[in-house]
């Protein structure tokens, strides 16, 4: 059975929902609600930040320094945890000020600059640690279990 993509995409307990909360998004939603196969989320910040301000927030939350391309003010975000760098055009088409994902490819930097969208690469592992913790807590509460998340640092 497959669990990775459903864990990424779950609107309440998934990796994307959790990363949205860490960034300060109060109401994250799927970028394309009509296509559940697109694991990109979007949302609005309650108060505008600079791209570097958002990167600093992520650095504290994820305990790592992200790669930042671009600058300017951010209110509208799109993001996809893990290896979501291929969705940057969808984020730009949706009018996001910044696109956040786990990985970066060489072309991602060029696409960001050409499309005028800021980009933050925050680490594949770092962006996907929180969905499994949320599901663990949910299962523990529902089934009366105890659980422990063992985080093994990964530079990727």
Predicted feature descriptions by range:
Residues 1-156:
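Active-site catalytic microenvironments in core metabolic enzymes, especially phosphate/sugar-handling
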């Amino acid at each position: 059975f497959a669990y990775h993509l459903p864990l990424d995409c779950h609107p309440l307990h998934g990796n994307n929902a959790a990363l949205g909360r860490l960034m300060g998004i109060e109401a994250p939603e799927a970028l394309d609600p009509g296509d559940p196969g697109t694991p990109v989320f979007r949302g609005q910040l309650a108060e505008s930040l600079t791209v570097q301000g958002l990167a600093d927030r992520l650095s504290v939350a994820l305990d790592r320094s992200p790669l930042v391309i671009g600058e300017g003010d951010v209110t509208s975000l799109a993001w996809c945890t893990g290896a979501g760098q291929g969705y940057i055009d969808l984020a730009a088409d949706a009018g996001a000020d910044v696109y956040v994902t786990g990985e970066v490819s060489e072309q991602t930097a060029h696409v960001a600059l050409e499309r005028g969208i800021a980009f933050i690469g925050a680490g594949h592992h770092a962006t996907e640690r929180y969905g499994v913790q949320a599901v663990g807590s949910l299962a523990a509460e529902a089934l009366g279990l105890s659980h422990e998340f063992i985080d093994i640092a990964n530079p990727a």
